[in-house]
């Protein structure tokens, strides 16, 4: 199954222990407590479950769901 914007938001929220509705699409996720270890864990899961080919550096450079969507293959 393809990764979706909702799926990314849900996964990020779960990683942070937050409600998905509290995670904006366009905000810097570092400001919400996302760190490099969590980014790596999220990316690992997406690679296994959705065959994502994004690089950690690309996600770390642009830490927002909106910026990640095209990198993760969400159209």
What are these regions (language model features)?
Residues 1-21, 41-45, 49, 70-75:
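Thiotemplate assembly-line natural product biosynthesis machinery
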Residues 37-63:
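Phosphopantetheinylated carrier protein domains
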Residues 13-32, 49-57:
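Phosphopantetheine carrier-protein modules
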Residues 28, 63-66:
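Short, structural beta-strand-to-alpha-helix junction motif
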Residues 1-2, 6, 33-36, 62:
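Short, solvent-exposed loop/helix junctions and linker helices
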């Amino acid at each position: 199954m393809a990764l979706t914007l909702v799926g990314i938001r849900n996964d990020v929220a779960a990683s942070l222990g937050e409600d998905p509705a509290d995670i904006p699409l366009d905000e810097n996720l570092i400001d919400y407590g996302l760190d490099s270890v969590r980014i790596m864990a999220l990316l690992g899961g997406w690679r296994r479950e959705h065959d994502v080919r994004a690089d950690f550096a690309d996600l770390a450079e642009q830490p927002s769901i909106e910026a990640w969507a095209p990198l993760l293959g969400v159209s």
